[in-house]
Amino acid sequence: MNSLEPAALAQAIDHTLLAADASREQIATLCAEAREHGFYSVCVNSSQVPFAARQLAGSAVKVCAVVGFPLGAGLSASKASEAALTIAAGAQEIDMVLNIGWLKDGLFDEVRDDIAAVLQACGKVPLKVILETCLLDEAQKVRACEICRELGVAFVKTSTGFSRSGATLEDVALMRRVVGPDIGVKASGGVRDVATARAMIEAGATRLGTSSGIAIVTGAGTGAGY
């Protein structure tokens, strides 16, 4: 990323609201904020996609949705179906959670097939793969990134924001080293202020998942939440 100025930071942000109790009013506010501040996308649960798409019609802000979230432990066919249905409903990017248990068990072919099923369902829609790095050791993080690189996904992503902890600079740097320059790295979970956002980008992130986008682009202290 060539600039860390507010406009460039805004275009790196997926403005996020994934709470189970998120209301229509909150989603409408999320979308209005994304329009106002020029965020790249809003990131919402799949059931909120049609409403968010209507709110953002005519704007440059994209609708991103999560799949297999937050555990990643569902059937691969279910994840693929959810991705396809969510795209049909208006999603323009998909963030999926890989099967963490399979990865930790060393079932790498199964992990690959799980991601590949969703990737196929996405077609030309960019797919980000969430590793949930706080649950993995370094070798597992590396293997997950290698699989994602080999499959040609659009991004690898650190975290759901719903587990033990979120993105770290060390994990972002590791992921960037493994996937190389052609795949995006999304840092999510705990990115709540401009200093952290800039540090994540300097470490190799090209996208930030956060509910604190306004605090980041205005420099207004530390945001709360995701």
From Swiss-Prot:
InterPro entries: Aldolase_TIM (IPR013785), DeoC (IPR011343), DeoC/FbaB/LacD_aldolase (IPR002915), DeoC_typeI (IPR028581). Gene3D superfamilies: Aldolase class I (3.20.20.70). Optimum temperature is 30 degrees Celsius. The keyword Cytoplasm applies. Changing T16L: Decreases synthesis of CTeHP. DERA is a potentially valuable biocatalyst for synthetic chiral compounds. However, the poor tolerance of acetaldehyde limits its applications as an industrial biocatalyst. Mutations that improve the aldehyde tolerance represent an effective strategy for enhancing DERA activity. GO terms for molecular function: deoxyribose-phosphate aldolase activity. Pfam families: DeoC (PF01791). Changing G189R: Exhibits higher activity toward DR5P. Decreases synthesis of CTeHP. GO terms for cellular component: cytoplasm. The keyword Cytoplasm applies. Pathway: Carbohydrate degradation; 2-deoxy-D-ribose 1-phosphate degradation; D-glyceraldehyde 3-phosphate and acetaldehyde from 2-deoxy-alpha-D-ribose 1-phosphate: step 2/2. This is Deoxyribose-phosphate aldolase.
